Amino acid sequence: MTAVTGKVMRLQLVLALALASAGGSAHAGDLLQSYRDAASHDAQFAAARAQFDADQEKLPQGRAGLLPTLGLTGNTTYNNFDVKSQGFDLVRRGNTNAYAVQLSQPLFRWQNWVQYKQGELQTGLGAVRFEQARQDLILRVAQAYFDVLNAQDALAALTALRVAAGQQLELAKSSFDVGTVTITDVHEAQSRSDLATAQEIAAQSDLDVKYQALALIVGKEPGALAALRKGVGLARPQPDAVGDWVQSAEGGNLGVQAQQLALEIAEREVERARAGHLPTVDLVASYGHSKSRSTTSEDFPSASSGVARSDGSTIGGQLNLPLFAGGGISSRAREASALRQKALSDLDGARRAANLAARQAYLGVTSGMAQVKALEAAEMSSLSSLEANKLGYEVGVRINIDVLNAQTQLADARRQLAKARYDTLVAQLRLKAAAGTLGEDDVASLNALLGTP
């Protein structure tokens, strides 16, 4: 078993397990189940699966050029001859039936051998591309899932802001009625309440859109989703050095692996094109049988009939040496060489892209964790500020706008904190994808951070 074949078999096993598990739940209750549902229903992944199945046929197609071909031909004819000459007429009528079997076995066809090796590489390339599609599915599901959770948290924060602004509006109105505040305070509170209501409506609409985006991937309307458990800590990348991740990405990134295989295929194509100048040798064998039945009559009372049978077989070698093909073979060789150079440049570009992706994802994780820590402190500070401003307003040392600003600041801090957490979680997956190691185990690890729906 070759390394490519082994990898294909492992991918087929992974695909079978994913499909088997996808039918076990009717709802996308958590991240892991969402991924499994998407593996069965997502249109892009289904297209990638079909392409993977098609790519697996490259190997038997290439092998066919090394195997013998066997053909059978047959014919039947009716003969009718009427010969007129001086003194007599000759009439001959009858059937001739024949068949032949031809066998051809390539002995030396270098183009066919190279094509077979290309088939092995193309099968491996199909497996890598399918793995890319699977990693892309994980990222799309995770992004859509956490987009929903982020939209839910944003809606909750804005709902709380709208309620708080409404309470502050009522307080401003009652204070105005007793003459402790001016009408300006009422108008400010009314403006903040209206703005909070508008933001809440927009957040609800955004949540609906995010739900539909997730439903598009998982193939069904998601029910209640498991949210991130409170107090969950985010782990730093392991290894915790950007250089290690960059090194892994430059060798293990699936885009790099795909381009490496594409380069090998292009190199084989150069070899196959140049092989057009080489001779070919085939073993050929045939067997033929024919049988004729005819009746002959002349200008005499009697007529004669007869049967003729023939059998024959041949076996030998056939050499074909191309001498001149109009320059087509040389042109195809130059074309293949240019495409090989293109594949080499594509590989270099893939390595650079993997390098950048690893750096961006690593910084996304590390800077995201720093942002989460800072925003957690900001949330606590904003909450303390709100309580202090409320107390100051009650005793007359703070004005209405101070309380409104503190409420808005707390809502903003909570929304930014939620987004930073979810962005960091997705960045962790993107870092694994950049290194080429992202798999269902990573989805399960993130899923363990979630509570129950």
Summary of predicted features, one role per range:
Residues A46-A50, P60-A64, L107-R134, E188, ...:
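Sec/SRP-type N-terminal targeting helices
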Residues T73-Q105, L228-P239, E267, E271, ...:
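Small/polar, glycine/serine/threonine/aspartate-rich low-complexity segments that form flexible
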Residues S21-G23:
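N-terminal signal peptide c-region/cleavage motif recognized by signal peptidases
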Residues N80, A361, R414-P453:
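Acidic, low-complexity, intrinsically disordered peripheral segments
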Residues T2-A3, D136-E250, A262, G364, ...:
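Periplasmic alpha-helical coiled-coil/stalk elements that build and connect Gram-negative outer-membrane
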Residues H27-D147, A151, A165, I183, ...:
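Short flexible linkers and secondary-structure junctions
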Residues F176-T180, Y393-V397, A434:
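A short glycine-centered flexible hinge/capping loop motif at secondary-structure junctions
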Residues A26-T73, F81, D89, Q105, ...:
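Bacterial Sec-pathway N-terminal export signals of envelope proteins
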